[in-house]
Structure formats: structure tokens, C-alpha cells
Design a protein with these regions (language model features):
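Short alpha-helical donor nucleotide-sugar binding micro-motif in glycosyltransferases
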Residues: 71, 232, 240-245, 326
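Donor nucleotide-sugar binding/catalytic pocket of nucleotide-sugar-dependent glycosyltransferases
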Residues: 127-173
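Acidic anion/phosphate-binding donor-loop and adjacent secondary structure
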Residues: 165-182, 219
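Conserved donor-binding/catalytic core segment of Leloir-type glycosyltransferases
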Residues: 176-211
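Nucleotide-activated donor-binding/catalytic signature segment of Leloir-type glycosyltransferases, i.e.
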Residues: 218-236
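Aromatic "clamp/platform" in nucleotide-sugar-dependent glycosyltransferases that forms part
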Residues: 253
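Short hydrophobic beta-strand element within catalytic cores of glycosyltransferases
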Residues: 270-273
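A charged, aromatic-enriched C-terminal amphipathic alpha-helix characteristic of glycosyltransferases
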Residues: 303-332
Length: 333
């Protein structure tokens, strides 16, 4: 592909910590090494306010002037819209008005989140999201299960875009615990849509660690004083939490994939999770498949999994392969 200038349009960017940011932070350096120039249109470039339930998520407004200038100054060869917020819709509007082709990606099940918090029917929210993707040449989706879900809501031009994992950073060699106590670890947002309380209330004689921040953090700290809440961790520190865990517990039923599952597996840590979108798409090898509708039973299964099998499973899931797929799906404007 000869194109050199890629415009990424996103409502999710640093300092946010989420799967969207992780994915693109991982692929951008590889794209740049291949000779592509990358520019990102993101919330910090606009006037914005914090999302009511999540202070770290910014809602942009008065987007037209800055969006128009971004496109006119940069003149991208490729446009990819990463999210369905105000910035994403501003990018879509510019592309349509100027007859530019674009691709997009679907990362987050906002309809499920909004239904849990505001009781708005999923069908209504999906209709709004579908509008952004309706003119997209290709809609990149992180899992087969999520692709099938979106088909039910009449999304078109869907393709599966597989994720990678940094197997150098997330590595069993980071394990440095001498503790004889079994350790169950959760990494992610501390929020009701992550179903985290199913993990917190598990009746087990094991140590539980929660890595992450979120709107329910203080409530759960007060409610579960016996659990170790350590806040957000990144880099080497995060890698140690994964590697030192005996089981990584992923209680969410609303994820589109779950990058954290891949990071835990690369660290040699088996997964306890429900048989839902995300986990069922990742844990396809019977040696590491511990899925169960009973989370405690899944934990028990995970404790029997060989750590080396978890690690070996991830060795083929490289970010280079992820970038190759990404470029195959891109289109010239």
C-alpha cells in the first residue's frame, strides 16, 4: 500500500485507559516504522466536559471548525474512525460532505452500558451507532461473536480485526511472588457494566486484588475492606500483577473482546470467565478453556490449567499481525 498519511478519529485517547487506547498505542509505532504518518483527532483538541459517570471520558463539542481545519491541513490518504462519540461523528460528517471514503471500528458495547445505567433500550442506542458506521467502507470488529451480534442490529460491511499482545512486556518471567496464598486478580474499570461485583463477592479463601479505577471504586472499597484495591497500574508494574496472579478473573458480560485477557494469558496466568462474547472468542484452545456460567467453578477449573499452555497460546498473537490486517482493511479516501 503506497498511502502514507493516516488520520485516526477518536473520542478515546490518552490519558484515558481502555482497550481502544491500548490497541492504537500498540499499532501506531509499528505503522510509523512502516513509513506511515499518523495524526489523531481527539477530545483534548476540542472544548469538552466530563462524561457524567466517568470523569476521565471527555465529551467534545463545537467540533466543526477544528475538524475541518484538521482535514484541510493534513490531507490524509486514509481515514479511520475509531469511536462513535462527537469526535467520531464530526469526522464522519466531514468525510460525507467532502466525498471521502473512510473505515471505522467498533470497540465498545455502549448500548449495554447505557441500558444498565440509564435504562435506555439497546435497540435505540444501536440505531445511533449504526448511523456512524452506515457509510463506512469496512467496520472492523474485534471478535466473531461481536460481529454476529452487530448483524442482528443490521450493521453492514463487518470484518473481524484480530488483536495482538505484547508478549515481551507481559511475560511469565515477571512473576516474583513467594506467597503460598492463592491470588485472584482483576484488571480493568471498576464499574457496574464490568460485572466486577460477581468477582468481589466470590466466597473463597484466596487473596483478591483489583487493579484499576472507576466510578464504583470508593463504594467497593467500603463494602469489601478485605480486598486489596491497588489503583491503576501500567507498564512493568502492571505486568507483575498479571504474572503474580494464580487466576485472572474476568467477570464482564459486556465486552467486545477483552485485551486484558490476552495480557494475562501472555503472562502465563489462566482465566476465569463466563462463556460470553470476548472470552469465548479468545479461549478457543481446550487446554485453557475454563469458561463456566458459575464463576467459582471457572476459578476452580483455571487453577488446574498449566501456565505454560496459557503463555504458548499467545505467542502467535502479535501486534505485527494485527497491523497487517488493519492495513488490508484500509481504503484510499
Amino acid at each position: 500500500m503506497q498511502h502514507k498519511k493516516i488520520a485516526l478519529i477518536s473520542d478515546a485517547w490518552v490519558p484515558q485507559v481502555n482497550g481502544v487506547v491500548t490497541t492504537f498505542q500498540s499499532i501506531i509505532p509499528i505503522l510509523e516504522k512502516k513509513g506511515f504518518q499518523i495524526k489523531i483527532l481527539h477530545p483534548e483538541m476540542f472544548s469538552n466536559f466530563s462524561y457524567p459517570w466517568y470523569k476521565e471520558i471527555k465529551i467534545s463539542y463545537n467540533t466543526k471548525k477544528i475538524t475541518d481545519k484538521f482535514f484541510k491541513d493534513y490531507k490524509p490518504d486514509i481515514v479511520h474512525i475509531m469511536t462513535e462519540g462527537p469526535v467520531g461523528f464530526a469526522g464522519r460528517k466531514y468525510c460525507i460532505q467532502n466525498n471521502l471514503k473512510y473505515t471505522s471500528s467498533f470497540h465498545t458495547r455502549f448500548p449495554d452500558y447505557i441500558k444498565q445505567r440509564a435504562f435506555i433500550p439497546k435497540k435505540f442506542t444501536y440505531s445511533i451507532l449504526r448511523k456512524l458506521h452506515s457509510d463506512s467502507e469496512r467496520v472492523l470488529v474485534p471478535s466473531v461473536s461481536m460481529l454476529n451480534e452487530l448483524k442482528k442490529y443490521n450493521f453492514k460491511n463487518l470484518v473481524v480485526w484480530n488483536r495482538g499482545v505484547d508478549t515481551e512486556l507481559f511475560n511469565p518471567n515477571k512473576r516474583d511472588t513467594n506467597s503460598k496464598d492463592t491470588q485472584l486478580t482483576y484488571v480493568g474499570r471498576v464499574a457496574i457494566e464490568k460485572n466486577i461485583e460477581e468477582f468481589l463477592k466470590l466466597k473463597v479463601n484466596y487473596n483478591k486484588i483489583v487493579v484499576g479505577d472507576g466510578p464504583e471504586l470508593q463504594k467497593y472499597i467500603n463494602k469489601y475492606p478485605e480486598i486489596n484495591f491497588v489503583g491503576v497500574k501500567t507498564g512493568e508494574e502492571l505486568a507483575k500483577y498479571y504474572a503474580n496472579a494464580d487466576v485472572f478473573v474476568f467477570p464482564s458480560k459486556t465486552d467486545t473482546l477483552g485485551n486484558v485477557i490476552l495480557e494475562a494469558l501472555a503472562s502465563g496466568t489462566p482465566i476465569a470467565a463466563y462463556p460470553v462474547t470476548g472470552p469465548i472468542d479468545i479461549l478457543t484452545d481446550e487446554r485453557i478453556n475454563t469458561l463456566d456460567n458459575n464463576l467459582l467453578q471457572s476459578v476452580k477449573k483455571a487453577l488446574k490449567v498449566k501456565r505454560v499452555d496459557c503463555r504458548n497460546f499467545t505467542l502467535k498473537l502479535t501486534w505485527d499481525k494485527c497491523v497487517k490486517e488493519f492495513l488490508e482493511y484500509m481504503v484510499n479516501v
